[in-house]
Amino acid sequence: MSIEVFNESGYDGVNEEMLIDVLSFALGEMDIHPDAEASIHIVDVDTIADLHVKWLDLEGPTDVMSFPMDELTPGYSRPDGATPGPAMLGDIVLCPEFAAKQATKAGHDLAHELALLTVHGSLHLLGYDHVDPAEEREMFALQNELLADWYDNVEARGVTYQPKPSGAGAFPTAADRLELDEKMEADDSGFGGVES
């Protein structure tokens, strides 16, 4: 996997190596060609708010946005799977300032929140969405499975980014995330609404 990180946020405390690791793991588990490319852009609140309006016509900042490029489907190495070669998956845009507030409300640290959002963004790059309830349940279940498996993989490799968190907020269901979104909307921080 070729993954580039562009940190334009000016926000301290973002572990770019961890973001590359979790994205590489998630895409590998989804059986995406090992030569596929993706990028992670780490931006400030104003930038993600502008992107949110421009691309989704939604006011206010958000935590993560994904911009797919080449349409790929999981299953590269299966005998009956698609055989696409290397391709540009797309861009994941993260806002650590917004994510930090969500992490606090969810009861875990920023690093975990950014790992969760990176997996979430990777699934959007692969065509997953959460528009209807069935899709939402499928996407969040897969997101949580990939994230938990990544923590297990990191531990098995003897790598330490942060401890694997526990509790409902660590591996949220779609309903948990909706509740968190509502808390963020009610927050008087001036961030406004959220749409992942």
Curated annotation (Swiss-Prot):
InterPro entries (UniProt xref): MetalPrtase_cat_dom_sf_prd (IPR023091), YbeY (IPR002036), YbeY_CS (IPR020549)
GO CC annotations on file: cytoplasm
Record EC number: 3.1.-.-
Any single biological process term in GO: rRNA processing
Ranges in coiled-coil conformation: none
Keyword vocabulary terms for this entry: Cytoplasm, Endonuclease, Hydrolase, Metal-binding, Nuclease, Ribosome biogenesis, rRNA processing, Zinc
Keyword Protease among UniProt keywords: no
Keyword Secreted: no
Cellular localisation: Cytoplasm
Domain of life, per lineage: Bacteria
Name this protein carries in UniProt: Endoribonuclease YbeY
Source species: Corynebacterium glutamicum (strain ATCC 13032 / DSM 20300 / JCM 1318 / BCRC 11384 / CCUG 27702 / LMG 3730 / NBRC 12168 / NCIMB 10025 / NRRL B-2784 / 534)
Gene: ybeY
